[in-house]
Amino acid sequence: TPPAGPDVGPR
């Protein structure tokens, strides 16, 4: 399962 929330994707 991919991480949910605003901490997803490149920083």
UniProtKB/Swiss-Prot annotation:
Q: Name one GO cellular component term.
A: extracellular region
An annotated GO BP = venom-mediated perturbation of signal transduction in another organism
- According to UniProt, the name of this protein is Bradykinin inhibitor peptide
The places in or outside the cell where this protein is found are: Secreted
Query: Which tissues does the record link to its expression?
Result: Expressed by the venom gland.
MF terms in GO: toxin activity
What UniProt keywords are attached to this protein's entry? Bradykinin receptor impairing toxin, G-protein coupled receptor impairing toxin, Secreted, Toxin, Vasoactive
> What job does this protein perform?
Bradykinin inhibitor peptide antagonizes the vasodilatory actions of bradykinin at the B2 bradykinin receptor (BDKRB2).
What family does the Swiss-Prot or TrEMBL record give for this protein? Belongs to the bradykinin inhibitor peptide family.
Organism's domain of life?
Eukaryota
Principal localization? secreted
